[in-house]
Regions:
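Bacterial N-terminal signal peptides that target proteins for export
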Residues: 1-8
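Substrate-binding/active-site clefts of carbohydrate-active enzymes
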Residues: 40-46, 54-271, 291-300, 304-309, ...
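Active-site-proximal helices and loops of the catalytic beta/alpha 8
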Residues: 30-31, 173-175, 180, 191, ...
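C-terminal motif of bacterial Sec signal peptides marking the signal peptidase cleavage site
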Residues: 17-19
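Active-site-proximal beta-strand/loop segments in catalytic clefts of secreted hydrolases
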Residues: 52-55, 117-120, 187-190, 279-281, ...
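Bacterial signal peptide processing site
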Residues: 21-23
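Short acidic/polar active-site loop segments enriched in Thr and Asp
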Residues: 112, 274, 404
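Conserved, mostly hydrophobic/aromatic
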Residues: 51, 106, 116, 155, ...
Length: 563
């Protein structure tokens, strides 16, 4: 693209965000009653690229520790599937250096932040308890390692597979910022490691160490009901009942546990975390997250957090977003489910199926514009879409309300349709990234992601739907505040033939500029904007300036009053 949108858009973003400082992430109270905006939180301007760090790129082979584990090795550990297919439950070599080496690749695609799986230290052995995991299996941990980072033995220490002699976690975050990328850290409160049913009690499993390396808790390979917290201090970090598979169940009611965890979160902020993704948030009571968010935001008022509540019922996951429960955003699972339904078979589906999950009015969320939106991740099957299905999914994801999140490799359709132990988390690698820029999915993603990156209305604007029907979608995104005023008209076509659009509703006179092509149209008063959108295409027409349509202003106020 030769059209340069950066100067105007960044100046608007800078003015707008200047008004955002020192405000609660879930508060728009500083705005006057005439302001038209979906959300004012600073993080709304971000687009997130998600990596399972060990499976991204091996940037430093010296930290692979291929001989680690002895009789319980940790390197690769393939699961054999049909027709030569494989998945892996051991370490594959990815590290922070691998992410840093590809910072410009990620930034150039249009992303502004990288969410990485937890950096915490994990056990140095494959787990020898539980039933053995097999290709395509689930909810079994036998034979697996903590390559993913979610089995922490020390919540304050980085795993040796991720850092390098010349690249600590704080070094990494500082260098990523120099590349224009924020760092989203993955945190856990529900559990530690798999902790019981081991044939032999292996070092690290069931154990938790403090910041100084002192042992503060040990499950001692005992079933939860056999723990004796009254007489054994090392058992007091745990509930005496199970939760997820054979993982230790951390006792969030214990003040020592709460302090240990929350202080670890504050520590990682000091090491450069810009936001948190919270694992298994619904497995920990709201009271814990209220205390955690209060303590975090006391020192970091604008700190953004979003949780994984793996539930497709909006009323259930929305409870986490309420201020009384900590005001934590969530991954938008209801939209994820709808996106898979629509974009796996775009020629057979209807855009109307996405309307209800937007919850633009009468919804349960504290603010739907602050949800993190996605179509797949590492805990579910990757979307089984064609290249055009991916392209249409991205065109939707980067123009509708919410903060988009894309899982590594999606830009090339990597391992499409595969679940966790069937290839979903397979190693991506530098070679694939080096070839990615010629892939049609990556090229189309780069175009629309960079439009969002430079268009304030797509980041924060109120969404006003005009048409969601069949292969066609048309909607406005509108910002009109003291600091920024911009209207974006989004037109989507997921069909295999061109679609003509004639937009009369809420149309405003003035110059409209299409952001992907640079084409300009001047619309006179009472005229329509007429255009044709190519198959599997998107157009984003932007008008700078305050809203002049009283009908549009009234519609936005109506929606915001009923949000």
């Amino acid at each position: 693209m030769s059209f340069n949108r950066t100067v105007v858009a960044l100046s608007l973003a800078g003015v707008f965000c200047a008004a955002c400082t020192n405000t609660s992430p879930n508060s728009d109270k500083y705005l006057n009653n005439d302001a038209l905006v979906g959300t004012s939180i600073p993080f709304a301007s971000e687009a997130v690229y998600f990596v399972v760090t060990d499976r991204f790129v091996d940037g430093d082979p010296t930290n692979n520790y291929e001989d680690q584990g002895g009789d319980h090795p940790t390197w690769q550990l393939p699961l054999e599937g049909p027709e030569g297919k494989k998945a892996y439950v051991g370490y594959m070599g990815g590290d922070l250096q691998g992410i840093l080496n590809n910072a410009d690749y990620i930034k150039d695609m249009g992303f502004t932040a990288v969410w990485m799986t937890p950096v915490h230290d994990n056990p140095d052995y494959a787990f020898n308890g539980d039933e053995p995991i097999t290709y395509g299996g689930a909810f079994k941990d036998g034979g697996k390692t903590g390559y993913h980072g979610y089995w922490a033995t020390n919540f304050y220490q980085a795993d040796e597979h991720l850092v390098s002699d010349n690249l600590s976690v704080s070094d990494y975050t500082a260098k990523m910022r120099k590349h224009g990328l924020k760092s989203v850290f993955d945190i856990v409160a529900n559990h530690g490691t798999p902790s019981f049913t081991m044939e032999k009690d292996l070092p690290g499993y069931g154990e938790i160490y403090d910041k100084e390396g002192n042992l503060v808790a040990d499950h001692q390979n005992l079933a939860p009901e056999d723990l004796d917290p009254k007489n054994n201090a090392l058992h007091r970090f745990f509930h005496n009942y199970p939760d997820l598979v054979k993982l230790s169940n951390l006792d969030d009611k214990n003040p020592a546990v709460r302090d240990y965890l929350i202080n670890s979160y504050l520590y990682w902020i000091s090491q450069g975390a810009d936001a948190f993704r919270i694992d298994t948030i619904r497995h920990v009571p709201h009271a814990f997250w209220r205390e955690a968010s209060d303590r975090i935001r006391e020192q970091n008022p604008d700190f953004f957090m979003f949780g994984e509540a793996f539930d497709y019922e909006a009323n259930n996951i929305a409870q986490h977003t309420l201020p009384k429960n900590g005001g934590v955003s969530v991954l938008d699972f209801p939209m994820q489910k709808a996106m898979v339904s629509v974009f796996e078979k775009p020629l057979e589906s209807d855009f109307a199926d996405l309307e209800n999950v937007l919850y633009l009015t009468h919804g349960p969320y504290n603010n739907p514009y602050e949800l993190t939106t996605f179509y797949d991740n590492h805990d579910m099957a990757r979307i089984n879409a064609t290249d055009n299905g991916f392209i249409n999914a991205h065109n939707w994801l980067f123009t509708v309300r919410g903060i988009p999140v894309v899982y590594m490799g999606s830009e090339i359709g990597f391992m499409r349709g595969t679940a966790e132990h069937a290839g979903n988390r397979n190693y991506l690698g530098q070679k694939r990234l080096d070839q990615a820029k010629t892939h049609p999915i990556q090229q189309a993603l780069t175009n629309i992601a960079n439009v969002r990156k430079t268009t304030v209305a797509l980041q924060r604007g109120v969404q006003v739907n005009l048409e969601l029907n069949g292969h066609r979608a048309a909607f406005y995104r509108v910002v009109d505040t003291k600091g920024a005023a911009q209207t974006a008209l989004v037109l989507l076509n997921k069909g295999d033939s061109a679609e003509a659009f004639v937009i009369n509703d809420f149309m405003q006179s003035g110059e409209w500029v299409e952001q992907l092509s640079g084409q300009s149209k001047t619309v006179d008063q009472d005229d329509a904007l007429t255009t044709t959108v190519e198959p599997n295409g998107v157009q984003v027409w932007v008008r700078e300036g305050k809203v002049t349509s009283l009908a549009l202003r009234d519609q936005i106020k109506y929606q915001l009053a009923r949000q």
